[in-house]
């Protein structure tokens, strides 16, 4: 009989390399369901534990969702505390054991004796085996122990950090003879170095031949440096991260680490032996709960000897038998164990790396998904709450199609025969679907208009749903931004069809292509999860929710946002569905009714937020409903694709019931699809009855309903609408009544059994009324044959909440803009006023931890809801300004001694776990040093202070301040600067990373004990003196007064503290009080910072030498030196103890050095606001910026809350999650008013294709009546005019401004007049023309005709009854949110007009006479008509029909004129006008001539009419057969920019019309062209009298220098107006913003953020390039990012202007031309655009810029993210763009020809060397060639920087494939473009891709020329990206040759060919990331550092 094998499990320790183990188990998990299940369960448990850590601890681990994700922190070396290491090793070891157990299940039962050997952390996985008898139990137990293991790792980390927080290893190993000498070596070292007990090194692991020494890294380093024996020994540093096996350190609470779980009571296997590493015998335990504390004692405290463990282990094995040794994870202990077993004569069979034999599939369970948030807009309901009201009121919301969508009457044809006919004019519509807060979502108005309204509304909807869910990205494991996915259903392209009327805009793709909707959502919210756009017709949103459900269950994401929208914008689908017979002709959906005749189209927007149920419960979410199951199938056997199929629907119900584990009778309600079509309703009801409600199967009828009867069929959004209604029934506990019931029901045979009930009244739907857990089915099907079905269940019953112990709370409100902020506050105030019973704690929790926060903020603190109401009421309406706070600096001020009191932190100690843990932990450490206990001084207000020792006071103060630092850090507040007063400096040094917490407490305690032991209390004391600064200074300098005293503290200019003997201080107090000084003898036992302390200094110096001093991580302002201190040592602390406190000097230093400013936030760390008073005495800090952490007479939470509120309002990011984490069991998310969006209307009506297209136009300028209404209170009408109508187009084309066709003001006036006339006469133009005046016509947005698109102008007229005034607004339908023009048309009394004209005539007669006399005497100018219009052509180019002026007399100063006018006769017989625009212009444009026809005015400026205050020109008064005169004059201008003029029209001796208040604005002609959206036409060359400046820069021709061939043309300075450069640059900037974004000028305020109006990096470059072109001012490409608001930019522009004026005073205001031989050189056909990316353009030759040549895509945008490359702001960095970046198809030239153009661009910017050149990717190759040519021309090249591209080969591959778009895509060259653009089909992306292909094609023909040895750059740098773009396997399939032009091999970071071109002297660097990610955040930061270092090496 064979001898049974004995099993030994070997678990190494936590220092073993984890990555091989991790990779192995992850790979094997693909084939093992058991292992896959364990890995996920273990990670889930670890995530729960990590969620409880501090933010700093979480940051070291990083976000993770898998074992490999956890291990990433090891690869990235962020796991400096070893937490991820220890957890990863544990999980990997258990994973390997699972694989072994699958191969041999007997391993885990008790049938075979089993011995486990583990070292240190390896004991924990061994413990899991002790309590598991099979794989299932092992997975269960080990998953929990993974969490325990994490706690242990964190405890090790925390204990270690308390001693020393710096980097470095905590252990080294020693081999050989030195092992025996270690105890003596350590003892001598500790004594000689005065190492305090807590910092001593110790022997943790030992064997006869080697040992491991542990200790703080700095101590170990010093030990190895000073010990001769260790230097000679074989000692090696180990990867150890903390203190283990340390008996001298305080042990953590093992009970807390073990935790609570039923698994802990599991009995241990009797045949299983686990040896203790310290007792060398099996642990004596019966349950896990007994075993784990013993294991932890061995890990944390007890030394171990592995050799002895292994030797003893052999005694428990049967002698002579074979041993199966299972190495569970690679470990170095294997050698030692095998040696031991071999010595004991055991035969060892080593078992490693077993294959998985598991073949069976384990069902993971269907899972459940929680709906945690909802939002929606529906017909008649702007929110989910309003939807419920609509349902309960039985409202049916159909109505006639609103005219804003399209004119239904134009398309209605009940026969349906017309090409676009609709058979019904009804639908269910949203109110105001065009409203959108574009600024909130950083979208420009121009782009917003192109966006599908569904896309816009879904952005609102997602935001609102997130608020409802309380979801803040990054706030929990399930809310990790990398794991949030978006699923959107959409089935309509209406908006794209509508936009096609108006031509194609640059934003049309991302605005109307449906895939952009989920992409834009993820982009805005910064989510990295997958995005899905689903088009399944009516099943789109149901399918989207179904996909989201499955993704959550499959763990493809952790949170999902799902929903969709349906917006009706055109008649197309109405027509198509009408013709298909789908639509009801009589109105709404009549679900279940006998008169059902089709469905009614509806609109809706709906969004839900989903999480796995367990995650929702863990995150304290409000669960609205639970999705238990989902199924989807297709009706494959139906007779028609659009016809429902009963069997298929039945199978869908059956499948979802099976998946959910429910029976039909468990379902109480069905939310049906219910469209109201006979076939659909009948089939759906039949299938429901057959599966869910068969006869005699139910005790109560199954209730059914359908939302479509209320809201119509919202098509793609129908599924989400039904889901929201269904979820509301759970929330409300009620099924709403079905609309139309009880009407006559349809004939449904399946309902005859009475098992189904359609409710005509509300039905209770509570758990009590249903009698069981509520569950329902939600059904949805689509016209394409798909069936979707969900089972929903009520949410779990929430647990009862305990009361929140905090008496004070913070409530926050924030918004993106001031309007929204005020409305948010108003809504919250109203809510609280109406709901005063609201829990204050829940309100605080909801507004802080569960809301997204914006830049504009308000915060309120209080102890009751009424406090918050009062604060809100006082704050509401206050003008807080538009400024958005940045991130101000935070200064921590640490309190010194004397401010203590009993119970300083009692409230925090009682309920704040982090605070309490810090205090108790520090006390434990202090006790080990022999210091007295002190925690009661902090925690107990009743402590009698008279019995408290100095040591207790000092220790309690230091501990309190350290605990506050830790607490503030957890809350997200870390200082930028610290300053400590006296003893407060120790905690300040802890905050700065100079001292560890343990060292700080050791020093404070030692210092205090020395005081107590060496000095007599009460002999000396301290006296505080306050007075005027002058008086105090005089006292301090008076030797007689200061006799026997010394200044201990300089607290402020008017306050010092003296130290000395008490009798002398008493005398001094009496003397100074008599001199009116304020004096106070302080209650302190010693005279600190005085000579009394000299006695303790030697002892303190010795103690201080034993601690480690780190380098400050932040600024430390020393109150010893009064300056910033960067080096600290023991001597510093000795001086700090003895010398005076220089607080005044320290604060003064902060101010003078700019370390603090008026915005700095001061937070006092200590028991009270002592130092804040001193700071206020030294500075002018505002009260709200100076905050105490604690205050003696205030509850701790009150002062903490108040400080948090101030910090929050100032813009700091608060860790609200951590703030509430200890109290989560007391808090609930509550429903509050949703965000108040600052909306603007972006709706555009559809106008094409209706019947009105054939109707005769009303007039030439006003074509069609769209709608007219008279409601008794107001008359209104809407008209349209089509610009392309020939007569109107002719009028417009005859009116050109500066060569650009612009619609004249006369056309707008005529439109307004005719519209008012139409309303007054009822459209009867045969009636007499009423007397009408045009009042205050303003033109804000000119209209220019657009070719290739249907341009429609809309005219809106309103007149209140009993009013004479019509309000008229005119808009371009392509931009309906922008008012083109507006005016008032007033019905006038002719008698009043006559009287007015008489007065006017009296006023102008003398002026006319005087002007005629001047003309007769030759003073005034007389112009005939032709000359008049020639002069006017400076601005105006009129068609012949406008030229009515025959002669004009113009005053000498061009301020007045008199013209003779003959009105042109109509040339078009079809022309019909109330008042012809030709006539209006001819009669009035004389006033414009005075400005624009003046030959003395600069041709660079024009004067544009902006407003006409009043115009009265009656059509009946005028005739082309009468000669008229017009007199015009200008008022004096106040600013030379704005002008006002008047025109009076005379016939004979009477005024027959006038125009008063014609306003003009002066602007540069270039700005006009920008506003009108046209390129600036070339100006004719002018001769100049200025001296020419010859360019002498050499250029190269065929490698030779030439001084004449290529000259650099310097850009001319901008033309100066009255404000010089600033006016020009600022005005061009604003004009560019208006054009690019579509904003109105009035909307672009100084506070406007460029990002929020849609200015991205590409648009920024475009704007700055235009500024350069038009003004000559060159700004770097990051200018609009560095100065993110208009105000910031304007201030910087003014600063630059002042510098420019100071540098060039002689050229200010002059034109400078750069010429050669008197003529400007002709510009080359192709030029590179050179973009200043950083710094300022060099002003002299001593400053050398860096030129970066564009990559293969050709754009400068590639370099936009580079950080500053100059050590200061002295380096100009230029990006040289490709000459073909705008038209890449033209890039067909050779490499040499392209390089010549780059060279010319570099030369033009910098004519002479030395040069700095470089480039990324293809730009690196071009930069090489440019450098080669410059060197050949004799120039000096300081440096060449090539970024991540191989050198072009000297030996091209003859078999290389010809480049194609597919090939370069395959090799990854387009990856960067695809990452940048969400849609790679966008015009910008397509253009860059085409350029990339052109570049590759150019390179494919390149054979480079190497540089000769004597002509090479002085330094060459090559930078490589470490990661591959493609998976390694993908490279095997690449076409030959082309890949050589891209990535280096991942293992080859060397020359890659560059050494063949530039020689061997190349410096190589590597940066994290792949080829494309290194150019974006965060990897670009590291690249920036490399480039900065390279540039620094090249500076001369």
Swiss-Prot record:
It is an enzyme of class 2 (transferase). Gene3D superfamilies: 3.30.70.3290, 3.40.47.10, ACP-like, alpha/beta hydrolase, Malonyl-Coenzyme A Acyl Carrier Protein, domain 2, Polyketide synthase dehydratase. The gene is atnG. Residues 1263-1392 are annotated as: N-terminal hotdog fold. It comes from Arthrinium sp. Residues 1594-1607 have a biased composition (Polar residues). Residues 1416-1569 are annotated as: C-terminal hotdog fold. One of its GO terms (biological process) is secondary metabolite biosynthetic process. Disruption phenotype: Abolishes the production of arthripenoids. Residues 891-1150 are annotated as: Malonyl-CoA:ACP transacylase (MAT) domain. Pathway: Secondary metabolite biosynthesis; terpenoid biosynthesis. Residues 1263-1569 form the PKS/mFAS DH domain. Residues 1620-1697 form the Carrier domain. Residues 1725-1923 are annotated as: Thioesterase (TE) domain. PANTHER family: FATTY ACID SYNTHASE (PTHR43775), SI:DKEY-61P9.11 (PTHR43775:SF37). The active site is at 538 (for beta-ketoacyl synthase activity), 673 (for beta-ketoacyl synthase activity), 713 (for beta-ketoacyl synthase activity), 982 (for acyl/malonyl transferase activity), 1295 (proton acceptor), 1481 (proton donor). Transmembrane segments: none annotated. This is Non-reducing polyketide synthase atnG. Non-reducing polyketide synthase; part of the gene cluster that mediates the biosynthesis of the meroterpenoids arthripenoids. The pathway begins with the HR-PKS atnH that catalyzes two chain-extension steps to form a reduced triketide, which then primes the SAT domain in the NR-PKS atnG to initiate three more cycles of extension to give a linear hexaketide corresponding to the polyketide part of arthripenoids. Pfam families: Acyl_transf_1, CurL-like_PKS_C, ketoacyl-synt, Ketoacyl-synt_C, PKS_DH_N, PP-binding, PS-DH, SAT. Residues 9-245 are annotated as: N-terminal acylcarrier protein transacylase (SAT) domain. PROSITE patterns: CARRIER, KS3_2, PKS_MFAS_DH. Its EC number is 2.3.1.-. The modification O-(pantetheine 4'-phosphoryl)serine is found at residue 1657. GO terms for molecular function: fatty acid synthase activity; phosphopantetheine binding.
